Amino acid sequence: VDYLERTYAAGKIPGGFFRREGRPTEKAIITSRLIDRPIRPLFPKDLRNDVAINLLVLSVDNDNSPEIAAMLGASIALSISDIPWNGPIGGVSVGMVDGEYILCPTAEQREHSTLELTVAGTEKKVVMIEAGAKEVSDDEMFDAIMLAHEEIKKLCAFIAGIQTEIGKPKFEYTPSEIDAELYDKIKEFCLEDIRSAYSTDDKN
């Protein structure tokens, strides 16, 4: 996933002689990872085709964050394409101001929020959670996740409707098969060494 924010999306032009965009910002890189995490596990495990998702922010205000819209755009694009994928997914951000949950809070609301939660998932399960908070209880966090998932179900149903209306048939591919005999030999040769490497507390 490649998420790009251009300054012209906010009505600005870069300064300097060349007036070109620089490398992706840290926020753009983190957003790319945020969108990639819930999407990646839903591809068939034996699919070996390279899939690139490019998300370009064309216009945005300074009050609403474009990350969730980009995640939904990626979900819709994959759903209506011919790429095999076990979506759709939906994504929601949740804040909490004065003890009240707020879905997709604005920039001003986020400044006063004691919870910053992003949830992504399918109609049946939550796939990804990213959260930061100023001391919220376990029950409050659980309720926020459940609230987010209820909204995600609605978004998934909406995207499924789009897929039904304009989606392409998924292409057929030849599954990648693992040589069982070779797998067993590799497992016998190095499994214990791998386990030892993962469990060691030696930093050298």
Language model region names:
Residues 35, 45-96:
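Glycine-rich anion/phosphate-binding loop at the beta-strand->alpha-helix junction
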